[in-house]
Amino acid sequence: MAKKSKIAKNEKRKEIVARYAERRAELKAIISNPNTSDEDRLDAQFELNSQPRDAAAVRVRNRDSHDGRPRGYLRKFGLSRVRMREMAHRGELPGVRKSSW
């Protein structure tokens, strides 16, 4: 199981990303728009750089929803491969069954 502090830090990052997401999207649209003046583009870049580092979505780590394991994460289930396998064997995941061919 992951350290509780790492899980808490990741949750805090998710909140910060959600708080700044709309403004970041606006600034990125201004920067990428070819019709934007150089001055406006520069202002948008400065504002984007002045935002907190954790406001970027790439700073959030996908973690297992049960124990916070950071590796082997399966998006479809929100679980790590280890936890998904355990739950599938116990029949706790609807629609999942062992394959055979």
UniProtKB/Swiss-Prot annotation:
It comes from the Bacteria. Residues 61-70 have a biased composition (Basic and acidic residues). The keyword Chloroplast does not apply. One of its GO terms (cellular component) is small ribosomal subunit. This is Small ribosomal subunit protein uS14. GO terms for molecular function: rRNA binding; structural constituent of ribosome. The gene is rpsN. Residues 53-72 are annotated as: Disordered. PANTHER family: 30S RIBOSOMAL PROTEIN S14 (PTHR19836), SMALL RIBOSOMAL SUBUNIT PROTEIN US14A (PTHR19836:SF23). The lineage of its organism: Bacteria, Bacillati, Actinomycetota, Actinomycetes, Mycobacteriales. It comes from Corynebacterium glutamicum (strain ATCC 13032 / DSM 20300 / JCM 1318 / BCRC 11384 / CCUG 27702 / LMG 3730 / NBRC 12168 / NCIMB 10025 / NRRL B-2784 / 534). Keywords: Ribonucleoprotein, Ribosomal protein, RNA-binding, rRNA-binding.
